[in-house]
């Protein structure tokens, strides 16, 4: 039995005609350098010079070639050009979780700077799945990317380690890396955690819990910062750590566990803003008012943190600045692969909003 038929309709925007072949059926063949040369009345080699941006072409001939290319709808063959130049001007960015606003906002800064350096960005989403990570990196390598950015992902698999050995790579948010020629961009996560706990202690809180993000070294460093700060304030007996998974749902589940204890915490420091929003949801579900009954602090200062009615107190790590820093490191390493590995650490700041207040009892 034959399968169901599928009808496909293609709609073109007004003012743009679908190129068709001379017989009227299907798209016409793609124009070639030869077609551009014939239309402009120049040689194929001169067309190649113009398309490569060579300065050794008169302005008159350059404009003639560009005009012919526009009229024909010619697009240079990126694969062929990369074989000639030895570069594709492509960068592959592999992201642990595109649902996390921090990663999306980081990519804004990364793409902005890469574009200024003449590089184009390809993005893959691993969804925290090691198999997806390997597949995405292999796809990037098949496209002969000039460089890799691993965001929230440590190169631990054989595929990723091998890739970093011959492809310029920058890792963001992971510190536990001992690979030559790999640059790192991180936030001072321990300092950020201490800022959060100091703020809560100043408000009179003692029973301060932490929901730990378990999927990255950043999460571990934030937890260590929490532990150090609690002990420094002589609050070790009140330490409470609940495991989370860096999502709103994970924050809700962890918060339910914490907030049904007796005595319950009066404040929660969450691994990131997404987890903190899950905490807010759990508090509302249990009839707790924020900040009157419970203070909540997130981490990242994503755009969601400042939205109403959330108004989340959070630790700001400059996401776009981190993206720009990663782009600079990568561009430098593409130009000089033999550079010594470098680490760029940004300094976080506490942003106080309405989700924190004085401890009640």
Walk through the language-model features, giving the residues of each.
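Catalytic-core regions built around general acid/base machinery
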Residues: 158-166
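Short hydrophobic/charged patches on amphipathic alpha-helices used for structural packing
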Residues: 80, 134-137, 161, 197, ...
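Acidic, Gly/Pro-rich loop/turn segments at junctions of secondary structure
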Residues: 147-159, 174-181
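Short beta->alpha connector loops
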Residues: 127-130, 151-156, 274
């Amino acid at each position: 039995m034959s399968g169901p038929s599928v009808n496909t309709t293609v709609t073109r925007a007004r003012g743009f005609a679908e190129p068709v072949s001379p017989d009227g059926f299907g798209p016409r063949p793609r124009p070639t350098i030869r077609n551009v040369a014939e239309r402009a009345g120049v040689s194929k080699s001169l067309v190649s010079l113009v398309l490569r941006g060579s300065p050794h072409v008169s302005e008159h001939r350059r404009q003639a070639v560009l005009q012919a290319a526009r009229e024909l709808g010619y697009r240079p063959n990126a694969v062929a050009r990369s074989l000639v130049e030895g570069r594709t001007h492509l960068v592959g960015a592999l992201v642990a979780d595109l649902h996390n606003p921090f990663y999306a906002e980081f990519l804004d800064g990364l793409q902005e700077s890469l574009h200024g350096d003449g590089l184009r960005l390809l993005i893959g989403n691993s969804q925290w799945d090691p198999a997806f990570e390997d597949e995405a990196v292999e796809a990037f390598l098949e496209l002969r990317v000039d460089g890799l950015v691993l965001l929230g992902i440590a190169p631990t698999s054989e595929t990723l380690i091998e890739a970093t050995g011959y492809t310029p790579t920058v890792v963001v948010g992971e510190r536990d890396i001992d690979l030559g020629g790999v640059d790192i961009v991180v936030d001072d996560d321990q300092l950020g955690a201490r800022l959060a706990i100091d703020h809560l202690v100043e408000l009179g809180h003692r029973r301060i819990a932490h929901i730990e993000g378990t999927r990255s070294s950043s999460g571990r460093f934030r937890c260590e910062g929490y532990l150090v700060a609690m002990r420094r304030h002589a609050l070790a007996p009140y330490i409470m750590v609940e495991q989370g998974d860096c999502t709103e749902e994970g924050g809700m589940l962890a918060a339910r566990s914490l907030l049904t204890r007796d005595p319950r915490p009066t404040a929660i420091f969450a691994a990131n803003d997404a987890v903190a929003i899950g905490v807010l949801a759990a508090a509302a579900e249990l009839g707790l008012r924020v900040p009157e009954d419970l203070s909540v602090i997130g981490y990242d200062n994503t755009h969601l943190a400042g939205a109403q009615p959330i108004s989340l107190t959070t630790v700001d790590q400059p996401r776009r600045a981190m993206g720009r820093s990663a782009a600079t490191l990568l561009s430098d390493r593409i130009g000089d692969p033999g550079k010594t590995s470098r680490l760029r650490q940004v300094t976080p700041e506490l942003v106080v909003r309405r989700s924190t207040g004085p401890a009640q009892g």
